[in-house]
Amino acid sequence: CLCGLAACEDIYKGGENHQQTEVAVLFKPSITSYDKDEVEKWKEGETVGVYMIRNKADFSLENSINQIFNKKMQVQADGMLKVSGEEPAFLYPTDATKVDFILYAPWNPSLEENVLQLDVRNQAKSDFCDYLYSNNAKNKYRTTTPVKVVFKHVFAKMIFHIRNGEGISAEDLKVL
């Protein structure tokens, strides 16, 4: 004898009228590390830029849902993402519209044409020397369950081992 159980999440209220309630978007972020033996964790207060676009639509403000287009969220102590300060929560569409999420970190409020600029000349601002990017959350319906977003490093990690040799002395390498 086989028996199966299934459960659905009730996101409606109002009995027979089935008035849809507003559902806030929740994210549970993780980071894919450069090194498989190393676990990267978010720090409380880190910022993330969020885009909520109609499923399979072109990446544009016109296709954004509820004007969620480069909006800021912050990492909380529990590792979840939350809208900053007194800003209203990001809400799913109240109909059955599917959405795609694109996220990046750290958040930059003044992106020009949605291009992230990387300038490694000033290493003091190390947060802006490496960006994280996530586009794995696609085809999502509204839910109270946090959306799992996996961030990856956008830029490759390079390690240079420079040694002195012909034409380059050990003294020359000290100034590098």
Predicted region positions:
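C-terminal motif of bacterial Sec signal peptides marking the signal peptidase cleavage site
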Residues: 4-7
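Short, low-hydrophobicity acidic/polar segments
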Residues: 10-175
